[in-house]
Amino acid sequence: VGFPPQKTLTLFDTGSSDLVLDKAAYNPKWSLSSKNLHKQFDFSYGSQHVAGDLYTDKVAIGGVKASNVPIGHGNGDFNSGNGGTFGLSFSNSENSAFDVQQLPFTWAAKKQHLIQSSTYQFTLRPTGKATLNVGRVDLFELAGPITWSDKNTDHTFWRITTELNGNKIENAIADTGTNFIGGPPDQVKALLDNLDGVSVELAEDGSYGGFYSCQNPPHLSFKVLGQTFDFPEPAMNFGFNGDKCRLAIFSTPGMQEWILGSPFFETASVILNYDVRRMGFAKYR
């Protein structure tokens, strides 16, 4: 970020649309290319909250450097373990905390002719190398054909319908910024009840969770756009409860729709094409 560049670690988040950096992760005063927009922002991310000032600056990821990208510079540090959040959902008045005219990185890079296609390829292997390709699809990451969705009609989030062991999860938000798979309590319970090798428990807050034997994990797979992708055990494992493992699928209080978080992204190479608003899925090597 900036010039000279300030290197920082961000969470690439398909569930939000803004680039928000912690106070310690970026100092606009050290950048010759920063511009103070003299506007403020107020940003909520999960249970975290940050406010601060809006700037524009140079931003580079994956070898692609765009100029005049809006950045929220927090007045504190809100993102534990990361320097900030790099939003990759669709930017609009409903989804953005920024009241600015400047384009977010996804569109700025395309308009400035830095990439031919506004395409982002996530290949998140649960045990091994994870990559994000910007502006292109790396076919060497793939072990099979790409299946493409129809045009995404939601102007805020990426959405997809999938099946887990034959149980349909419909029109779910695909969100790399959430570290579990969740949905409405009654629907989560119904799905977990249908999974062999998974026991269902009700928590005091009314949420449902699934548990399985760590020595004998269930065989789970997602069916997406006609292709089947195994749910690897390291991706489905959300932690331990005694001698049992907690499944990374559970409900949380007040959850009204399904969210396919990062464990879902660890099952396939997932491609987001902003130009035609489609998602692609393929097996990874």
Model-inferred region functions:
Residues 1-6, 60-67, 116, 163-168, ...:
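Short strand-coil-strand connectors
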Residues 1-75, 194, 217-221:
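Signature of the N-terminal lobe/flap region of pepsin-like aspartyl proteases
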Residues 1-7, 38-53, 79-80, 136-168, ...:
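Pepsin-like aspartyl protease folds
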Residues 14-15, 166-194:
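Active-site beta-strand/loop microenvironment that shapes enzyme catalytic pockets
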Residues 76, 219-285:
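Aspartic protease catalytic domain
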Residues 13, 59, 87, 134, ...:
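A residue-level signal for conserved active-site and pocket-lining positions in enzyme catalytic cores
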Residues 67-167, 244-251:
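Aspartyl protease catalytic domain
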Residues 2-3, 8-13, 19-21, 172-176, ...:
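Short hydrophobic beta-strand that contains or immediately precedes a catalytic carboxylate
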